[in-house]
């Protein structure tokens, strides 16, 4: 009883979280958004089931379908049936396809496993479901899943798939099998290669006419033998003897959720002969086939892989000005999980790049992780009905602006503070962008080095800075005074690499001010263009003023 109460509470919490993210739309706006996406998904369904074609990745289709269902629930509409074919077919299945309930996570699986025993895990092969009917040892009929009760007659197509046994003997001579027709792969690594739109490709091959040769790129994974042997080991042995060897190879006994997680992770990274999108855990003991009905299989569940790419809603478009004055665009997202990382922001790039992407709040974008776990945009998969884009700031900034604070300089000024505090410059541990914003908002810095004047009391009384960290921060600010001259020059934004600056052997501000363009040009990696930039930088009025201020603070190398 406690287990079922826990499951119920989990479901209620999930429902609460789903309601919490309902869009703040008027009824008219909601109707328009739902109607547009519903029509598009219907068109994709028609293409998929009638033509065997798909213009959209399987994973994107699944996530947009889930988004539509969420919107419908939010605004009191009846959710659509998940990808049910427009033409269900006329051939009755001897045994109904039940489908499989998908669990959210390992904890949900653990709760389910407590109520079942003699459990086995299989890969959730990504393809299209089929019924194989054998009578008197021969393949008598092959039926597409359809609506689970009726499907299309695929006998002629399946008879041309060489990997599907056309004759069987022994216990399978008069049997009904259920399985997945899949695209054969050599060494498919799901973690690296993703879904490759396998489901749509298989459907396309099965729907089209006159493609008998390409059918040999398909095979079948049998996952159910209704009314078969009671022992799973006997089932697997008989299937393997009949030619369905993959089922025995990829079915393992499991005792708990940890073992399932281990196998799931192994198959996620291993070379497999098919595309998968998770694992299925099933009890060996099944009801008699006459009790099987679509959507009512309590003896098996699925635990899907997290998609390599996630569809995320754009909540806002924000503009950031870097220390060099370049304007970059960032999309703020409704949170999504990617490889155990919570992603709420993604960098779009320049204003021009943002305009090329044509992204507005309310759009749905496909996000994945690039190298080093950095989120990136792969595609814009759906654009909202009402689209209002913010106006980017005027491009008035450059590498020599905003050393001193002003209202228009807010973002570039903060970027300069973040830069000078970084490890490669002054190495101010324990403070990032949020901390700098808090300090500037409270103490209204005049310029990028004003923090040197803050007292321990001022730091301790700064909202947003924990009192326990204020003393440490003051210590860091004091230590910065001992940093070498070249680090301070880097903090001032000199347009040179650290290697070039070190090679210059400049050790004082006065020496640097008197260095010529020819001197800078002979440094490693510094051409005439960069040398002119250095001259322009050191002759800038703001830079000279900062140099004088640092001299007054007796910073090493700046003293007269």
Swiss-Prot record:
Active site residues per record: 124
UniProt-recorded Gene Ontology molecular function terms: DNA ligase (NAD+) activity
Keyword field contains DNA-binding: no
Residues of the signal peptide: none
Superkingdom to which the source organism belongs: Bacteria
Primary enzyme class: ligase
Substrates-to-products reaction catalysed: NAD(+) + (deoxyribonucleotide)n-3'-hydroxyl + 5'-phospho-(deoxyribonucleotide)m = (deoxyribonucleotide)n+m + AMP + beta-nicotinamide D-nucleotide
EC number: 6.5.1.2
Gene3D superfamilies registered for this protein in UniProt: DNA ligase/mRNA capping enzyme, Helix hairpin bin, Nucleic acid-binding proteins
Sorted UniProt keywords: DNA damage, DNA repair, DNA replication, Ligase, NAD
UniProt cross-references to Pfam families, sorted A to Z: DNA_ligase_aden (PF01653), DNA_ligase_OB (PF03120)
GO BP, one annotated term: DNA repair
Family that this chain belongs to: Belongs to the NAD-dependent DNA ligase family. LigB subfamily.
Job of this protein: Catalyzes the formation of phosphodiester linkages between 5'-phosphoryl and 3'-hydroxyl groups in double-stranded DNA using NAD as a coenzyme and as the energy source for the reaction.
HAMAP family: DNA_ligase_B (MF_01587)
Protein name per its UniProtKB record: DNA ligase B
Source organism: Escherichia coli O6:K15:H31 (strain 536 / UPEC)
